[in-house]
């Protein structure tokens, strides 16, 4: 392994990054296919259900992205140990991470229960609340299972095995789409449940994926030793504190980014059902870019954590910049067909002509913020790979809460630009976040390299 990783004389690491990143992207693309399928099926069932799903999905995205961010604290720990060839210590870290993730999942579940009883106080259309409430409760059941899946996935990612999670996610999403078809429309003996049916199918697939991942780690020969180490290890105060020290800053950083979109969704809801439905379609389309960029960014974190274990800081920098360049190219490749067919995209999700017109305009704004999005994902994950996560919280707060959200509100309402104004703020916040993350990454890696030289 050391010979394979230790190659600082290389000029670029595109092939190695792609070999790790492509399975992550493919697995995550299964999620976007699922999102498209959900939105397509719900939108053609009832437009009101599409708007209700948009609100609930945005709220849960905030929670699930934060939860995923917390689990990300495991990756640099596992990656560093893997790079140092100390694989016997990995099992204990995974067990402590699982315990920490369960505690955090319970906290998130309690917070969502409190929010459920206050759904009528956030200014949403009254006609949507009867659809929102049951869909909200059904999704609530799946939170803890998402935490189990995340822990297993971050462990496997840390040891550079990204294909298992890819196949599990693809399988789970196929099951989900089939379940949607049966339960939204009431095929055969199944009842026509509409939006509630989509929620039941999604929750069921999340539970199934968590159980499969646990089974793979415990019973598959390749991972059996890790599974034994996880089972026989114990919860320790130091490891538990380490998981929280690395997990919470990433969770908060991702939460603030997601909150900017979620609170923007709430503001769009003030404009009415039609803009909210268009916003939901745009969030679904933009997830295609998000999952591709974040998948490659995850590969950046994995590769960097391995080289940190070897103290090869030249390779650390090269992997970060090579990953960023790949993300720029991926954004361009994805963006060209989306822009060319922007007038047809809305029609895939709904027959409402007014919603389709909104979507065709918002697609242009979505493409504008792809540069900033690629920059901030790449260097946020580069910071995660070197386990420098605390500064990310401050930078995210400045970019999203001090700049992006107030700007979106000002342009949308006092300036009268409505949903266009709200969306104009996204590229500004994302680009500022990316610049701050990149600057901090360079500073920290230079410091690590200087310490290595001083101690040589």
Residue ranges and their predicted role:
Residues 1-21, 78-144, 190-247, 304-369, ...:
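Short alpha-helical transmembrane segments in multi-pass integral membrane proteins
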Residues 71, 75, 139-157, 165-173, ...:
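Short runs within selected transmembrane alpha-helices of multi-pass transporters and secretion channels
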Residues 22, 26, 56-59, 99, ...:
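Hydrophobic residues within alpha-helical transmembrane segments
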Residues 29, 33-51, 119-126, 182-193, ...:
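Helix-terminus/linker motif at the lipid-water interface of multi-pass membrane proteins
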Residues 47-58, 132, 136, 199, ...:
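Small-residue hotspots at the loop-to-helix junctions and early N-terminal turns
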Residues 8-40, 44-45, 61-73, 77, ...:
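N-terminal transmembrane alpha-helices
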Residues 19-38, 138, 172, 205-209, ...:
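Transmembrane helical elements of multi-pass membrane transporters/channels
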Residues 50-113, 146-165, 265, 278-342, ...:
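Small-residue-rich hydrophobic transmembrane alpha-helices
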């Amino acid at each position: 392994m050391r010979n394979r990783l230790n190659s600082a004389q290389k000029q670029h690491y595109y092939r190695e990054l792609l070999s790790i990143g492509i399975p992550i992207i493919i697995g995550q693309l299964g999620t976007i296919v699922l999102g498209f399928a959900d939105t397509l099926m719900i939108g053609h069932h009832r437009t009101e259900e599409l708007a209700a799903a948009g609100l609930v999905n945005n709220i849960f995205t905030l929670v699930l992205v934060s939860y995923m961010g917390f689990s990300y604290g495991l990756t640099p720990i596992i990656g560093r140990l893997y790079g140092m060839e100390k694989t016997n210590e990995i099992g204990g870290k995974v067990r402590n991470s699982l315990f920490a993730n369960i505690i955090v999942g319970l906290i998130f579940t309690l917070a969502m229960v409190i929010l459920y009883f206050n759904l009528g106080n956030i200014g949403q259309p009254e006609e949507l609340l009867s659809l929102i409430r049951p869909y909200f409760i059904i999704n609530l059941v799946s939170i803890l299972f998402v935490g189990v899946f995340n822990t297993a996935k971050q462990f496997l990612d840390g040891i550079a095995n990204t294909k298992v999670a890819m196949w599990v996610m693809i399988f789970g999403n196929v099951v989900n789409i089939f379940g949607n078809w049966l339960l939204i429309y009431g095929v055969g003996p199944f009842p026509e449940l509409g939006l509630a049916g989509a929620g039941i199918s999604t929750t069921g697939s999340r539970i199934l994926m968590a159980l499969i991942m646990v089974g793979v780690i415990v019973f598959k020969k390749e991972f059996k030793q890790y599974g034994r180490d996880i089972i026989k290890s114990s919860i320790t105060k130091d490891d538990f504190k380490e998981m929280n020290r690395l997990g919470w800053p990433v969770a908060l950083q991702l939460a603030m980014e997601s909150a900017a979109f979620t609170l923007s969704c709430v503001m769009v809801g003030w404009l009415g059902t039609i803009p909210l439905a268009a916003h939901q379609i745009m969030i679904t389309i933009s997830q295609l870019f998000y999952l591709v960029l974040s998948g490659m960014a995850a590969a950046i974190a994995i590769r960097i954590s391995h080289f940190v274990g070897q103290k090869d800081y030249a390779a650390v920098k090269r992997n970060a910049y090579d990953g960023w360049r790949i993300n720029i190219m991926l954004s361009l490749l994805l963006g060209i067909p989306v822009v060319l067919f922007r007038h047809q995209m809305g029609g895939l999700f709904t027959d409402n002509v007014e919603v389709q017109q909104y979507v065709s305009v918002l697609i242009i704004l979505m493409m504008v913020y792809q540069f900033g999005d690629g920059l901030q994902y790449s260097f946020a994950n580069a910071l995660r790979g070197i386990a420098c996560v605390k500064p990310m919280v401050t930078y995210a707060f400045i970019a999203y809460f001090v700049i992006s959200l107030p700007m979106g509100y000002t342009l949308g309402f006092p300036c009268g630009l409505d949903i266009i104004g709200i969306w104009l703020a996204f590229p500004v916040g994302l680009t500022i976040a990316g610049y701050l993350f990149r600057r901090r990454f360079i500073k920290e890696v230079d410091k690590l390299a200087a310490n290595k030289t001083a101690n040589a």
